[in-house]
Amino acid sequence: METATTLEIASCSQRQVEAAADPADAKGPRTSHQQEAGSPSLQLLPSIEEHPKIWLPRALKQTYIRKAGETVNLLIPIQGKPKPQTTWTHNGCALDSSRVSVRNGEHDSILFIREAQRTDSGCYQLCVQLGGLQATATINILVIEKPGPPQSIKLVDVWGANATLEWTPPQDTGNTALLGYTVQKADKKSGLWFTVLERYHRTSCVVSNLIVGNSYAFRVFAENQCGLSDTAPVTADLAHIQKAATVYKAKGFAQRDLSEAPKFTQPLADCTTVTGYDTQLFCCVRASPRPKIIWLKNKMDLQGNPKYRALSQLGICSLEIRKPSPFDGGIYTCKAINALGEASVDCRVDVKAPH
């Protein structure tokens, strides 16, 4: 508590009452009866047992802040005996009795506002007077409310996965300083709003890490001690996050030469067959470019002979001997030829009569 006292000390001295001017006064002393009849009573001020003081609560030494619509109820302890005279003023003027009520007690004074409004903000002064003495105290009350929305928001630029925004401050800050701005984004598909910046102090920003292929809208709220503004402006244009065109540059490389001369990886196998049963011979060859396959029997070319059917696919060479007879026995040769060379494999085929 702090004592706020302004003393004005009135000089209280007794005054001697002189008799009215009379010719008999100059001639001699007056009798006692004459003195009693001619002297008025002495006028004395009432005795002050306790000087007026105001004990201001510590919380009211700073600006007292309330939200619009809340109740203001201030109890200020005072002292003074006999009971002092208490008066309140608002910005130097008398209180509006339709909005503010005051109750003065023996030891306190109460200031009450049922629903505070911004017009109730200002300097309230309490004055306690007793005789020629007085004490004063000053209380600053600030009534605040939510700010208005920013006046506009504009999508300035979009590049890569980023978007640049600009906006202007609100016209009404709610009777107090702004704590900052809250920036939110929403993609066109879901329509859900997500906060990207809170209590941001500038009026422009860059929103990053946007998803490629989505289109975004943005909005900005203003914020003060009461909270966020009730509404927020939304960007008129959507930010389309385009997928960057990918440019492929083929790296130079030396082509491998896969050409090779024919080479048999699986040779022909000798076999014995029975007269009248079809027989097949197999071998595998590798070559590039594709080789020409020639089958020989006892070094005689079998091409065009209907008794034999030769096939070659994916490097697998086969020769079918249809219903062989003892005359079909002998040495069979498979020869592969291309531009890089040739190769050949042999096998012996024996044909026996059935038992």
Curated annotation (Swiss-Prot):
Positions of the UniProt region annotated as Disordered: 1-41
Keywords: Cytoplasm, Disulfide bond, Immunoglobulin domain, Methylation, Phosphoprotein, Repeat
One CC-aspect GO term: myofilament
Cysteine disulfide links: C283-C334
Gene expressing this chain: Mybphl
Residues carrying Phosphoserine: S39
Consequence of gene loss (knockout): Knockout mouse hearts exhibit a 36% reduction in fractional shortening and an increased diastolic ventricular chamber size. Mutants show cardiac conduction system abnormalities with aberrant atrioventricular conduction and an increased rate of arrhythmia.
InterPro entries the record matches: FN3_dom, FN3_sf, Ig-like_dom, Ig-like_dom_sf, Ig-like_fold, Ig_I-set, Ig_sub, Ig_sub2
Domain Ig-like C2-type: 46-140, 262-346
Pfam families in UniProt: fn3, I-set
Organism: Mus musculus
Subcellular location: Cytoplasm, Myofibril, Sarcomere
Omega-N-methylarginine modification, residue list: R322
UniProt cross-references to SMART domains, sorted A to Z: FN3, IG, IGc2
Any one of the GO BP annotations: in utero embryonic development
Biased composition (Polar residues): 1-16, 31-41
Protein family per UniProt: Belongs to the immunoglobulin superfamily. MyBP family.
Stretches assigned to the Fibronectin type-III domain: 149-244
Listed name of the protein: Myosin-binding protein H-like
Record function comment: Myosin-binding protein which plays a role in cardiac function. Seems to regulate conduction in the atria and ventricular conduction systems.
Tissue: Expressed in the atria as well as in discrete puncta throughout the right ventricular wall and septum.
